Amino acid sequence: MTSWIDSDAPVFFDTDCLGCFLWTSNLLVLRRLLDGRIRIPEEVVIEIMRRRPRSSRGYSVGMAQGDLRQFVSTGKAAVVCMELGSKQHDEFHRLVKGEFWGKRLGRGESAALAHARFAPGIAASNNRGDIVPYCRSYGLQWITTTRMMVDAVSSNRLAFEEARHMWERMVQEERRMPYPDFQSAWDSDARPEVETAATLDRPLNEE
C-alpha cells in the first residue's frame, strides 16, 4: 500500500487532529505536507467556529478561527459537505448514534470517517481508540499527528528541529500528545500507523 505521504488520496481531518496544527499556528506546515489534499468536513469547521473567543496559551481562539477562514478562502484546504440522503450522510448519522460497535463518536470524527470511506480517502485523527475499529472493518487508511510528523522528518520534508518546536507548541497549547516531546516520539516509533484491516493483526494499543 502506498504511504500516505506519497499518495494522492485526500486526507479528511477530524477536529482534534486539525487542531494540533491550527491552535499552534502551523497550518502552512500542514499544507507543505499535503498540498491539494487537505479536506476539512463542514462539521469540523462548525465545531471550531463555535469555540468561544478567549485567550489560550499565547494563541487566541479568535486568531485561530481567522487563520482557518483564510486557509480555506485562499484554496489551501477544501471544506467538504454531505448531501442529505447521501451515503456519507447516512454513515455519519450511524456513527454519531453509536450504531457501529455501540460506541457514539463525535461529529468531527464521524464526518472524517464517513468521507474517508466513500470518497475514498485517508482519515486523520488522534483518537485511535475510536477510529481504528472502523478503519479495520472497512480497510481504510488512517494517520495521526505523530505519524505525519515522524514521516515528514523521515522523508526530509520537515526538519527535525522544526518538528521539535512544533511539538513543544502543541504541548503548550494543551493538545493531548502521546509523548512529552518529539524526540520521544521519534525514538519510540517502530512501525507505520497507516494500516488496513488486511495488514493489522495485533491487539489495539491507544497512543
Give short role names for the model-derived ranges.
Residues 123-126:
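Acidic beta-strand-to-loop metal/phosphate-binding motif
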Residues 151-159:
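Short, flexible loop segments at boundaries between secondary-structure elements
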Residues 2-121, 132-133, 164-168, 177-207:
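Active-site-proximal, substrate-binding regions of enzyme catalytic domains
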Residues 129-132, 150:
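Positions that flank functional sites
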Residues 37-39, 140-149:
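Short hydrophobic/aromatic-enriched beta-strand-loop microsegments
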Residues 138-141, 159-160:
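Short low-complexity, flexible loop/linker segments enriched in glycine and/or proline
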